[in-house]
């Protein structure tokens, strides 16, 4: 996952250092509980500091060194993105940060997004943006129609540079939909990024056993806090370091080559 090498302001470095200190305190069980976590810098401030992004760049967060973590939407190699974590770890907040950042950094002619969720009320704040295609409740007929139309668009999408983000909040729920919708969703996982459709999907880590056959579709996996080491290892494919030490709703980790990259979410 590439990072954009802009200069990082002192505030970003200080916040990153605070997260690092808290992680060290958590690792030392003899240390008393740390003070409450300070608020993360605002998304608008972070994006203003970064400056204009290339059309193909999707903002995901800020790394420990204060530099932005970006996904190149014109490079399909990473494939669909799976965001795993415990309940309350910030998976929905991650998707919402992506949606808000797109609205602030890109024209709707370049990037749009649609959301599939069990809780559409959580997405009211993004409905006013022209980048928003729709908020689709799991199990509703409109969700089936959206997945079908998106698959058709991807099939015929040969030359356009426009990208569509398919933000799915809870893989297990979508995996239980009707057979035709599930088949089209699987096709989007397999072929979507090469056709400018990017599925970004959340998973409750404790429920991974219910959808274990789906995991092979995700080469790129991002993790929020996972307290159970066995679950973390099963999802990461090896001994994922320190996922239990991540700050809920703020901090995430992904594998970058042979290393693990920690990053944090700005506040929306």
Task: Show which residues each predicted segment covers.
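P-loop NTPase catalytic phosphate-binding loop
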Residues: 2-25, 37-226, 230, 243-244, ...
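Intrinsically disordered or compositionally simple regulatory linkers and C-terminal tails
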Residues: 30-33, 43
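Short, surface-exposed amphipathic charged segments that create phosphate/polyanion-binding patches used
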Residues: 235-242
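Beta-sheet ligand-binding and adhesion/scaffold domains
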Residues: 249-260
């Amino acid at each position: 996952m590439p990072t954009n090498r802009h200069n990082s302001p002192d505030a970003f470095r200080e916040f990153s250092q605070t997260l690092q200190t808290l992680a060290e305190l958590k690792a030392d069980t003899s240390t008393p509980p740390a003070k409450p976590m300070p608020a993360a810098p605002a998304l608008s401030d972070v994006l203003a500091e970064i400056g204009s992004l290339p059309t193909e760049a999707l903002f995901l967060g800020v790394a420990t060194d204060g530099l932005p973590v970006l996904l190149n939407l014109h490079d399909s190699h990473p494939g669909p993105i799976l965001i795993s974590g415990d309940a309350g770890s910030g998976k929905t907040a991650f998707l919402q940060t992506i949606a808000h950042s797109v609205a602030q950094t890109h024209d709707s002619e370049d990037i749009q997004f649609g959301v599939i969720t069990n809780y559409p009320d959580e997405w009211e704040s993004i409905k006013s943006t022209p980048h928003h295609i729709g908020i689709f409740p799991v199990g509703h007929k409109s969700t089936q129609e959206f997945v079908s139309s998106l698959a058709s668009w991807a099939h015929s999408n040969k030359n356009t540079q426009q990208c569509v983000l398919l933000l799915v909040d809870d893989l297990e729920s979508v995996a239980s939909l009707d057979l035709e919708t599930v088949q089209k969703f699987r096709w989007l996982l397999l072929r979507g990024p090469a056709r400018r459709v990017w599925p970004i999907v959340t998973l409750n880590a404790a429920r991974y056993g219910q959808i274990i056959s789906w995991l092979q579709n995700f080469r790129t996996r991002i993790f929020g806090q996972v307290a159970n080491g066995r679950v973390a290892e099963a999802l990461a494919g090896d001994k994922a370091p320190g996922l239990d030490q991540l700050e809920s709703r703020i901090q995430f980790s992904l594998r970058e080559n042979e290393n693990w990259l920690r990053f944090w979410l700005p506040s929306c």
